[in-house]
Amino acid sequence: MENLILEGGAAVNGRRILQSEVSMIVDKADEILSALGLVKGEDWDIVGSAGKKKADDTSGDIDICIKKDRMKEVLGSGDGAKDVYNDLGSHLESLGYDRYVVQTGFNQVSFGMPINDADDIVQVDFILVRNLEWSKFTQSSPDYTKDESKYKGHVRNVLMMCIVKYCFKRTTKRVTLDDDSVVDGEVERYVIRLTDGLYKTRKHWFGKNFDRIVKNDTLMHEYDELITDTPQGLIDLLFNDGTIDDFNSFETLYDAFMSDRFKFPENRERILVGYVMSLDSNNPPIDIPTEIPQEYVDKAREKERFAKEREEYEKANKINRRGRKIKHIETFESFVRSNNKYRYL
């Protein structure tokens, strides 16, 4: 979602890529990586929609996922969070690719690859991942030459993330504020990290002295726990008799989600409402798939209107709920799951 600001060749000011050029660009990338001893299909692979579009369509960039530990090994990088990315950028520069951008927040190095001459640049993204199989799954794209979908892979991914978000969330600290309103102070939820796997995470909204609730959340990385980093692990978590084909496109995932194979049918409404709100909040907003029933679109838009009105009211009356003093904190130390629902102890 957030990497939209740098898609389409924007990171290195590259031009659009013709589908007929994709294989040539991948071959050039292979020359760079094979010289380091990295093997296609084992250490790296192309992901995304490039090469899977109709002949007259273009791509903004070429996405290539590479095992981070292998890149670190072949470059002799240190253990610092940015070391391998900076080393990769320096290595590309030594090969003459001097137009590059290190984007550690997106786990990638984007660089300009000359095609016909030095000024004819296209963008290639080397994305460093923990697990290649997982990343090929999460960043796969339908084959548009075979009309496998009407939608981008991103539309499928947002649904996948919303399913996980609303099926696996619990409040670990509930806060009563000084006006007796009740809000979440700390939550635990599962999140999909496209380059890493499915994780259990925590975040809170407590201020520095834990006497107030603030607007921005704080991630509690000490609670990060890997749940699975295999496609089948995620599939089995969500579906009975699920297969990787269920995740091929938005349409196939939506069909599986609406079927009796989905393990959490009681969460369908809040997933679909949250899904619409997620697409609406994208910049720019993404068109809602026509498969989504209008009732959920209406409920999402009503929630959006209410949130906007509340924000305007609090601003006009100088009320900052996320900065209000805490009256009482209720902590849930443990929980069990019964019939696919959480019960607090």
Model-derived features: where do they sit?
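Structural alpha-beta junctions
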Residues: 38-40, 93-100, 165-174
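Short acidic, low-complexity intrinsically disordered linear motifs used
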Residues: 319-343
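Helical scaffold of the NTase/Pol beta-like nucleotidyltransferase catalytic core
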Residues: 1-47
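Acidic-residue sensor for enzyme active/binding pockets
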Residues: 2, 7, 21, 309, ...
